[in-house]
Amino acid sequence: MKISRREALSISAATLAGLSLSKLTLNGQQAVAQTADQSDWPSELVERPLRNGFPAPLPLNADGSAPEHPESAAGPISDPLMWRSQGRQTPQIEFDYRQMQIKVDTRGFANKTGTLHFSDLQQLPIRSHTFLLQCGAPNPRGIVKWTGVRFSDFADMLGLIPEAHYCRFIASDRFYIDESVQTLRHPQVMLVWLMNDEPIPPQHGAPLRLIIPFRYGNRSIKAITEMTFSTPGPRMPPLPA
């Protein structure tokens, strides 16, 4: 079906008007919410109690690394589990690590980009380590045996160059973290798919989870769906003396 230029302009104007009205309504709702929030906000600095039990102790070695525990100490992770989704429920995705398809966007900072499969990780040295997973609050908490690969080996497989300074991980519930590549290359940082010698359960982050044992648990992001590498800018050349 063909339409005239006049009709097209009319449709465009109506569409823009609708979008403007929608935006205005949304902004109006936000303004009401902001006004309500601000009306309850203290007009000066006031004393408030600290969060109960926060932060929980996170034992570390003198060099900042995480203590490694014997496999015999491994066990479950305590509740409550944290998901940022409807009803705090585990989002429905493909949980079988053998079927994982994870977007890896290296943005020109590596030789490889595209979709990560389990067969790619199988080419790397597979390792197991037993670490404490500790939330910033007293729970969730647990000593767990994790099996997977070092993130540094994964980065080398991609051919990541030094000018890639950060990686953003996005989870199935759209929670995300940004972490420096320098931190991710620490030998204790892992991409894991087994928990206590079994596939990671959906509620604990199947099919693939990041483990940073020397940070609180929310940095060990669950159910990775995307990884994007970026940089604030290439490193400066040495300055003249």
Per-region residue spans from a language model:
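Surface-exposed patches in mature extracellular/periplasmic domains of secreted proteins
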Residues: 162-170
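Short, hydrophobic/aromatic alpha-helical segments in well-folded domains
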Residues: 11, 150-154, 196
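A recognition module on extended beta-rich or small alphabeta surfaces enriched in W/G with H and D/E
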Residues: 188-221, 227-230
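A contiguous pocket-lining binding segment that forms or flanks enzyme active sites
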Residues: 175-185, 189-193
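Near-N-terminal "mature-domain entry" segment
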Residues: 21-153, 157, 213, 219-241
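N-terminal secretory signal peptides and thylakoid transit peptides that target proteins
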Residues: 1-19
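Detector for glycine-centered tight turns/loop "hinges" at secondary-structure junctions
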Residues: 109-111, 174-176, 197-198
